[in-house]
Curated annotation (Swiss-Prot):
Listed cofactors: Zn(2+); Mg(2+)
Protein source organism: Aquifex aeolicus (strain VF5)
Protein encoded by which gene: dnaG
Zinc finger (CHC2-type): 35-59
Family to which this protein belongs: Belongs to the DnaG primase family.
Name used for this protein in its record: DNA primase
Amino acid sequence: MSSDIDELRREIDIVDVISEYLNLEKVGSNYRTNCPFHPDDTPSFYVSPSKQIFKCFGCGVGGDAIKFVSLYEDISYFEAALELAKRYGKKLDLEKISKDEKVYVALDRVCDFYRESLLKNREASEYVKSRGIDPKVARKFDLGYAPSSEALVKVLKENDLLEAYLETKNLLSPTKGVYRDLFLRRVVIPIKDPRGRVIGFGGRRIVEDKSPKYINSPDSRVFKKGENLFGLYEAKEYIKEEGFAILVEGYFDLLRLFSEGIRNVVAPLGTALTQNQANLLSKFTKKVYILYDGDDAGRKAMKSAIPLLLSAGVEVYPVYLPEGYDPDEFIKEFGKEELRRLINSSGELFETLIKTARENLEEKTREFRYYLGFISDGVRRFALASEFHTKYKVPMEILLMKIEKNSQEKEIKLSFKEKIFLKGLIELKPKIDLEVLNLSPELKELAVNALNGEEHLLPKEVLEYQVDNLEKLFNNILRDLQKSGKKRKKRGLKNVNT
C-alpha cells in the first residue's frame, strides 16, 4: 500500500520544484546546472524528468524532489514534504506515514552523512583509492565513512529520525545513554533495493585489528540480507543493455569492475548466494556469468551458486580465473580487456560439460546429471540429455534418472541450536575440530559439508535461516558442544578401563 508521501512524489514534478530554486538548462532529455551543495564551476548537477530524481556527479548528492527541498531549505525531510504539499495544494497527514517510510528516510539521511564524512576523512578516502575505485564510481555508489557515533546521533535527532533509525538495528543499544554506530570507523557501502532506496549498509574495516573484516546491517523490517543483491539498482540498465549479468563474490570486486567500465555486475551481500537472490536476479536476466575467485573457496562457492541459478531458470556460464587470482588481481596483471575476453570465451555450463565429458566420462556424467536435476523445464532437460546421449551413448534412462540433488530434499528435522551451529559454520567460517564436538552422525555430515563450502548439500532451512547476534549464539552453542564432547570422551575412556 502506498503512503501519502508516495502519492505526493507522484503528483509533483521534480523539474518544476527545482526550477523554483535553480536555473536549469535542458540537455537532451535531462536538465543540468551548477550544484548548490558544493563549489561547482562546471555544471555537474543533473535532473531526470523520467526518473524524477536529481544527482550531482561532483559531490554525489541525489534523491527526489522532497529531498532536494529538505537539503536546500535545511529542514527535515518531513518538513519539506509538508512544505511541498502546502505549496501544491495537496493533502498530507504525517500521522499516516508508515513506519517503513520513516525508516527509508532515516537510512537515506544516514547515507548522506556517511558520504559527506568520506570526503572529509583522508585515511578512508585513501583506502578507497588504494582499492582501485574510480572517484566517479565511489560517488555513484554513495560510498561513505562512519566517523563518530555522536555525530551520527546528532544528525538523526536534528531530523527527528532517531527512533525510525533504531528500527534498522544499525545503532547498538546505548551504554550509559550513549549509542554506538555499528559501522564506526569503517568505509561504508550503501545497499539499495531495485528501486534505489537505501535499505542497509556493508562496512569494511580500514585498520588491521581483531574485528571482522566486513560487517553488514542486521536483518530488519526493510532489509533482508538473503533477499537482495548489491549493485542491482546501479547495474540493471547495463544488464538489460548487455543481455547478461556477471555475478561476483563481494562489494569491492563489483566496485573494481565498475571502475574498469564493466558495469553489468551484481554481488551477494557478503555471504553465499541464496535462492531468493537467484530468483531476484532472474527477473532481470536469464543469462549469468559467475566470476568468483580462482581459489578453492571460490570454486566451492561457484559450485553452490550454480544449482540456485539453474533452479531460477537462468543459463549459467562459469568463468574460471587462473589459480590464486581474484578479479582485481587479474585486471592488475593482465588488463581489463583480457578479463572481457575471458568472460566472453566462457561457455554455457551444459555446453561445456558435453564438450569436455570425454576427459573423464564417469565423473562428468554424474556432474551433468546432478546439474540437470535442477532444470525445471522438462523440454530443455530432455533436449540436453539427448545431446549428451548422442555424443557419449550414455543411456537416456540413466541421464534422466532423478538423483539426490542435495540435502534440501531430505526430511531433516533440525533443532534451533543445530540450525544456528550450521549457519555459524557457513557465515563465520571458524577453524574448529569436529572430532572434539558432541555431534550426531547426521549433524556431523552436514557440518563437514558446511566447512567444505558444499552449501548446496545443506538443508534449505539452514541456508535461508536469519538470526540476529549469530556470532554470540554460535560461540555459546560451540562451547556447549565442546563440553559435552569432553564428557562423552571421558565416559568412553572409563568404559574402556572397566
